[in-house]
């Protein structure tokens, strides 16, 4: 045994020195490293994982290193940087690499990786395997796909380098709203990417995007909605829009984004393209004249802007308040509320479009209502102050949308029976994703509910709203709520997205009614601010912005828990949205 220990000491003197001097950094490289790793079975020596003080570990240029070896995560819990570049890691990567709770930099470039651990990204997804990871370099490998839960595994990722792999698509989860809120640099040049999802607009912090030398044929116009994007590279892609292809080869990022924002993209006929080019030249001349005459450059884009006005609690003589009882903490602790005034749901299919956008948010950002739930109410029917509480299933009664009054326990059981019947009819092994939220309340002694000042339950999350506050075509002012058992920030992110969609719908509705308004034939001017004290002047395009009114959530003693929108909310919206505070 002593002889074996002596042999290890002689083979790995760097480890003995690091242990003796309590080093925080260790670099293993050089000509003798390959033979020693080969003798250790293509893995790092187990003794390396008995140095818990290490913050930085680099093993590079070793053609015999095929796997880090078991014990890395358990033995090096304080590791901040792990650099394993230009080795022979692959074709897979063992799950033992995570979790590493303190890791900030992971460099696996220049290896032979074909896959990452299936189902768990680079570590367990719940909780995140790499919760502090900021930089991930996977360039120069042979990856054909990324794990779907990569964003869950590394939610604080800021830089992702995928250059020089064999990827043909990004996983949709990577661009899910709020999935990677800090990602500022994405490089995936020299791959086989065929399509870029419009959902890339959800990367609110993206500054640099390099997708050169792929197989893209179209660049989504939504890319222009990334508010911080400063540098893009699409060279080496054969785009359908030849003018755009020429632009990406020589124009600045700003010009390309302006072209996308104006609607220029692949797939148009030659005649339409020439007409568009002529129109673009005309607009450029007009902008130049505006600049030379001292007029604002922003005037051209004013008609495309969305306006939101935040009304603070102090400006409202009768603010709505939500009180929270302590019992709800064990069931569904997080709630955010807001009031939106000035919606017009009467024209055409505006109401249906509003409800469809809410359903889409439930499917995407709310993860089929399992992460969070949205409820929208006709403010005229809401009697404040409101109470967010938890009640026994036998005592909680509600008049659900489209149904008769029922106890919560009976309603949930009925919905579960309906879901099971649907499963049998469609011959599925499990209930559809649409109904999975029904099981969130299994085993709960109390159910969450929102109660108005008259004692009526107006919301039973995540199950249903009440018929009492149902949204109708005549609804102008709405009370919005988002609840979650996951996090308060998720509630805020979803509320941001909901209000943005409402602003877009309001703008679209106003544009469709513009001719009637100009001709004076608009019959109903009742959709506005119901409170005469809450007035707002029109914007440059003659349209009034939506008013987003703050709602305070307090405990039973009146101490503030959260207010929305605060000064840190509604700040990651696209550049065409202006928030007046």
Curated annotation (Swiss-Prot):
It comes from the Eukaryota. The modification Phosphoserine is found at residues 314, 430, 519. It holds the Pfam family LRR_4. Keywords: Coiled coil, Leucine-rich repeat, Phosphoprotein, Repeat. Residues 262-301 are annotated as: Disordered. Residues 401-436 form a coiled coil. SMART domains: B3_4 (SM00873), LRR_BAC (SM00364), LRR_TYP (SM00369). LRR repeats lie at residues 78-97, 102-123, 132-154, 156-177, 182-204, 205-227, 228-248. Residues 271-280 have a biased composition (Basic and acidic residues). The keyword Phosphoprotein applies. SUPFAM superfamilies: L domain-like (SSF52058). One of its GO terms (molecular function) is RNA binding. PANTHER family: LEUCINE-RICH REPEAT-CONTAINING PROTEIN 47 (PTHR10947:SF3), PHENYLALANYL-TRNA SYNTHETASE BETA CHAIN AND LEUCINE-RICH REPEAT-CONTAINING PROTEIN 47 (PTHR10947). This is Leucine-rich repeat-containing protein 47. The gene is Lrrc47.
């Amino acid at each position: 045994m002593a002889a074996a220990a002596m042999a290890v000491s002689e083979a790995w003197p760097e480890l003995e020195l690091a242990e003796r001097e309590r080093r925080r950094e260790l670099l293993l490289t050089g000509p003798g490293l390959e033979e020693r790793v080969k003798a250790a079975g293509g893995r790092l020596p187990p003794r390396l994982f008995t140095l818990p003080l290490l913050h930085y570990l680099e093993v590079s240029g070793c053609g015999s290193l095929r796997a880090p070896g078991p014990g890395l995560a358990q033995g090096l819990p304080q590791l901040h940087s792990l650099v394993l570049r230009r080795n022979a890691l692959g074709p897979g990567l063992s799950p033992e690499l995570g979790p590493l709770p303190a890791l900030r930099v992971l460099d696996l470039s220049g290896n032979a990786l074909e896959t990452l651990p299936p189902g768990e990204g680079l570590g367990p997804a719940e909780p995140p395997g790499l919760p502090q990871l900021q930089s991930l370099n996977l360039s120069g490998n042979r990856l054909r796909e990324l794990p779907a839960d990569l964003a869950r595994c590394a939610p604080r990722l800021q830089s992702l380098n995928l250059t020089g792999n064999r990827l043909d698509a990004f996983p949709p989860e990577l661009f899910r709203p709020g999935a990677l809120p800090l990602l500022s640099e994405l490089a995936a040049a020299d791959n086989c990417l065929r399509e870029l999802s419009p959902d890339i607009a959800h990367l609110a912090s993206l500054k640099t995007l390099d997708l050169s030398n792929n197989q893209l044929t179209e660049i989504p116009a939504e890319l222009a909605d990334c508010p911080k994007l400063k540098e893009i590279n699409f060279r080496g892609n054969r785009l359908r829009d030849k003018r755009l292809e020429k632009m990406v080869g020589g124009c600045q990022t700003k010009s390309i984004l302006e072209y996308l924002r104006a609607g220029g993209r692949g797939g148009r006929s030659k005649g339409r393209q020439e007409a568009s080019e002529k129109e673009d030249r005309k607009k450029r001349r007009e902008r130049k004249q505006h600049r030379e005459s001292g007029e604002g450059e922003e005037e051209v884009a004013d008609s495309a802007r969305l306006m939101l006005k935040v009304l603070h609690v102090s400006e409202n003589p009768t603010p709505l308040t939500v009180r929270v009882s302590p019992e709800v903490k064990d069931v569904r602790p997080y709630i955010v509320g807001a009031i939106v005034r000035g919606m017009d749901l009467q024209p055409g299919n505006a109401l249906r479009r509003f409800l469809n956008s809410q359903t889409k948010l439930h499917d995407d950002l709310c993860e089929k209502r399992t992460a969070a739930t949205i409820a929208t109410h006709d403010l005229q029917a809401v009697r404040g102050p409101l109470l967010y509480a938890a009640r026994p299933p036998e005592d909680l009664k509600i008049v659900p949308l489209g149904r008769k009054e029922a106890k919560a326990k009976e309603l949930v059981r009925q919905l579960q029976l309906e879901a099971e019947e649907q499963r049998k009819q469609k011959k599925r092994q499990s209930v559809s994703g649409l109904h999975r939220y029904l099981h969130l309340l299994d085993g709960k002694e109390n159910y969450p509910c929102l109660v108005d000042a008259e004692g009526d339950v107006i919301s039973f999350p995540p199950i249903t709203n009440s018929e009492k506050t149902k949204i109708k075509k005549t609804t102008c002012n709405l009370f919005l709520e988002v609840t979650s058992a996951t996090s308060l920030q998720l509630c805020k992110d979803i509320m941001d997205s909901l209000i943005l969609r409402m602003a877009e719908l309001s703008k679209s509705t106003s544009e469709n009614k513009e001719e009637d308004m100009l001709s004076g034939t608009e019959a109903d001017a009742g959709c506005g601010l119901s409170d005469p004290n809450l007035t707002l002047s029109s914007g440059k395009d003659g349209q009034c912005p939506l008013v987003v009114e703050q709602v305070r959530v307090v405990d039973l003693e009146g101490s503030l828990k959260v207010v929305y929108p605060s000064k840190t909310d509604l700040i990651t919206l696209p550049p065409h949205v202006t928030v007046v505070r």
